[in-house]
Amino acid sequence: MRILVTDGMDKTAMAQLREHGHEVVEQFYEPDQLGEALRGFDVAVVRSKTKVRKEHIDAAKGGQLKLIIRGGVGVDNIDVDYAKANGIDVKNTPRASSQSVAELAMGHMFACARYLSIAGHTMREGKWEKKAYGKGIELQGKTLGIVGFGRIGQHLGVMAKAIGMKVIAFDIYQIPVISEQLDIPYVEMDELLAQADFVSVHAPAVDGGALISAENIAKMKDGVVIINTSRGSNVDEDALLAALESGKVRAAGLDVYADEPASNVALYSHPMVSCTPHIGAATVEAQKRIGQEIVEIIAAM
């Protein structure tokens, strides 16, 4: 089979595919070129950079394309239903990056609690702000509210409990056996917002507006910390910035943004924002696992 890799892939996994007799082409296509290019491939492997929309699927009709694989979890960059309606299957790799994303969320929690981002920045400016940043808080004993309790949320919950946090979770699809095994109770959204000292979002993008809206921020504790490593659209960035300015929100840790590359300079430049450029799954280990899942998916075709 001919396999297109648009946004990079683990080299070992690509070598395996070639050893199995497949032709692997590593090439990024601009949106106006993508649809026509897809006609010549049986499989397309994409990451978040490549968007496969209706017009690309229409342009690929009559060609070879049978499968689109999203290397990662979220498939909101692919018009999944339209692809399937046109005979093109869509798969993702949900297991591979869960630990990496959860660890980054935990890292942002520590950064927000102890001023790690701004303290490091000011030191590089030659400043010694010991008093200014000597008002950190511990995570032990605090309540973490996880919004979206899938694989990533579960990994984060286990780590948070290990350092002595109380963990509660909200998910529209509740799996009682998971809650019981991890000893992490489900609660309603409003209860989570009212109880949590830290709110970490791990839900897919939702229709109908941001999960972390001005209305929901108002329901949170004063001094709450908000973490988002899911999708940028899950947080109303203007509402978050206003809450940071007012002190309602103590700090925020962000890996994803409404626009990417991020364009809300006031938000990501705020001294109480710990920010990273959408690198949740960008670890050596996660990329190897993603590559192996892709190899397995193609082998099963």
What does each of the following model-derived ranges do?
Residues 60-66, 86-88, 165, 222-224, ...:
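A short helix->loop->beta-strand "cap" motif at the edges of active sites that frequently abuts
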Residues 153-154:
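N-terminal Rossmann-fold NAD(P) dinucleotide-binding loop
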Residues 149-150:
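Glycine-rich Rossmann-fold phosphate-binding loop(s) that bind the pyrophosphate
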Residues 1-90, 191-194, 213-215:
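An N-terminal-biased, well-structured beta-alpha scaffold segment characteristic
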